[in-house]
Amino acid sequence: MGKKKSDESAATTKVKPSGKDASKDSKKEKLSVSAMLAGMDQKDDKPKKGSSSRTKAAPKSTSYTDGIDLPPSDEEDDGESDEEERQKEARRKLKSEQRHLEISVTDKEQKKREAKERLALQAAESAKREAMKDDHDAFTVVIGSKTSVLEGDDMADANVKDITIESFSVSARGKELLKNASVRISHGKRYGLIGPNGMGKSTLLKLLAWRKIPVPKNIDVLLVEQEVVGDEKSALNAVVSANEELVKLREEAEALQKSSSGADGENVDGEDDDDTGEKLAELYDRLQILGSDAAEAQASKILAGLGFTKDMQVRATQSFSGGWRMRISLARALFVQPTLLLLDEPTNHLDLRAVLWLEEYLCRWKKTLVVVSHDRDFLNTVCTEIIHLHDQNLHFYRGNFDGFESGYEQRRKEMNKKFDVYDKQMKAAKRTGNRGQQEKVKDRAKFTAAKEASKSKSKGKTVDEEGPAPEAPRKWRDYSVVFHFPEPTELTPPLLQLIEVSFSYPNRPDFRLSNVDVGIDMGTRVAIVGPNGAGKSTLLNLLAGDLVPTEGEMRRSQKLRIGRYSQHFVDLLTMGETPVQYLLRLHPDQEGFSKQEAVRAKLGKFGLPSHNHLSPIAKLSGGQKARVVFTSISMSKPHILLLDEPTNHLDMQSIDALADALDEFTGGVVLVSHDSRLISRVCAEEEKSQIWVVEDGTVNFFPGTFEEYKEDLQREIKAEVDE
């Protein structure tokens, strides 16, 4: 690290702010540092069979000189007649016109093809947006023997704030997600809804928001799942306007004030001043109850907690990226304070500080909260109960995530023990060949289950007290996944260095990283922290070689292989290919009898189901695409891993698998993440770990552990929320 000179095996890139050397260096070909990106977004430029561009292409030349006006050779007859000269000139002119015509046709065809591709891309994006729209009719909810209606239970008590539905089933386009499940949501509690991806957690939130699962009419429900639509309204106004009642009362008060006096001070509508005054007083009382005087201040406080500076708060919402607009949607929900707030992965678009602020804010939430999250620390801090979606059912556990884990493990052992006894008895009954004996074993098991369920309910236990009808014991099915990165070959240090590097974007005068002096070797563990927009991803791009420093020097070993993961890489996958085709194209040198089977085995290790291996990547979920990217990184056999928000598309089991794999990996790891637990796992060894703080255009080392850095942030945030 620092200004240490590179050894002979290292490649050095020097960049000066000005001069011939800087110009010369900028023209050098930039080496790719990630094998997985080699063809990520390349297109096949070969014309397709039967395409218009091929049918109108120029005829094949018989010689490389065809169509080129050449000077006459020394052997040509100098005594050519004028007629021959004119004929020759005419032939040259005709050939030139034909060539220009061919070029013109080719240009037109190229433009047509580009226009066609643009239209196809727009159509694909439109289809994608259409597919993302929620189709209410695609979901079927059956409660007991009746199907739910969108408006909820007409007989709901106006004072009821709890939601209790027994024995309901949910299916989506024919796929059963929940079977004979029961839900119990008590007012004032904060629930964490957990389970593997694709099992129906987000669907359950949507059904509650749509009231297809009956919700008492007096309970207002708000689900935060989509970013706010960008327009000219400022971020602050967008948050305040989320309270429609407040906005309406303000408009009524303003209109009444205007109508109460004309240009001469008399009432335009002819109403008595006393009546107008009474109406205004009533409106002001209602506005005071809604906290109108402090509305903007409260909205500003929420936005600040989510990372918006004062300048950002007055910017138009249309000027923000999707991630920031998602924060505005979250701020709107927190400002409105619905009776039932539903959050689906709220931390995905937040930096670490914003996540810690949201934890502190939600811990003070007095109403009901149901949140889907794969962040263990977030669930431990915020939640008072856990709902586990497992095996098409909902299991309730008191306490936070740690409490759930201990309860879950105990439950798993008990269930497997009961199954082993039942399975042994059933096998013995089958050996007798007596079907009646088999039915007796099954009935006895059901009776025992019903007795235990009744006993648990009478004791007031929260685990499955509203459970489905008793069934015979089944083998407990756990979802598990294992990630693995191969052992890297040893390289002589230093592997990668940035020495006195500065960087700025040509079109971003407000952004600059200055005097960056960092390095990475085998075994190095780095967590990059700092607010969104400070330059964390830019720093990773500089380390990867995807950006060239404006000033300073980058050194890297010539044999260095870097594995790069970004939350946006899943969008760069070639959607028309299958995962197997994609990986074989990037990594053709596979060992074994069958290259395809070798690739499928690797995909399986990273948790991609076998039926997705040969499906187009476009049909995969975000989490499944992430698994394809991680598989590709593993196949590139990297020495250093650069990971930018790797948990956004992963469920909890996959995050744990990633943490285990990084713990075993002997190469270098540089991590940007809002997941505190993952950072703690990666930076567990203090001697090998570093915390780089990117803020105010600089990269500084935090003199302590990640836990100490986190505690400092939490103290600051608590003081802010207490104000």
From Swiss-Prot:
The SS bond pairs are none
Composition-biased stretches (Basic and acidic residues): 18-31, 95-117, 437-446
User: Where is there biased composition of kind Polar residues?
Assistant: 50-65
Q: What are the protein's UniProt keywords?
A: ATP-binding, Nucleotide-binding, Repeat, Transport
Spans of biased composition, class Acidic residues?
Answer: 72-84, 266-275
The record's GO molecular-function terms, alphabetically, read: ATP binding; ATP hydrolysis activity
Q: Which SMART domains match?
A: AAA
Stretches assigned to the ABC transporter domain: 163-423, 496-721
List the Gene3D superfamilies hit by this protein, alphabetically: P-loop containing nucleotide triphosphate hydrolases
Domain of life of the source = Eukaryota
Q: Which InterPro entries match?
A: AAA+_ATPase (IPR003593), ABC_transporter-like_ATP-bd (IPR003439), ABC_transporter-like_CS (IPR017871), ABCF_EF3_subfamily (IPR050611), P-loop_NTPase (IPR027417)
One of the Pfam families matching this protein, by short name: ABC_tran
Q: Where is this region: Disordered?
A: 1-117, 256-275, 427-472
Q: Which is a Gene Ontology cellular component entry for this protein? A: cytosol
Binding locations of ATP: 195-202, 530-537
Which protein family is named in the record? Belongs to the ABC transporter superfamily. ABCF family. EF3 (TC 3.A.1.121) subfamily.
Q: What is this protein called?
A: ABC transporter F family member 4
Q: Which organism is it from?
A: Arabidopsis thaliana
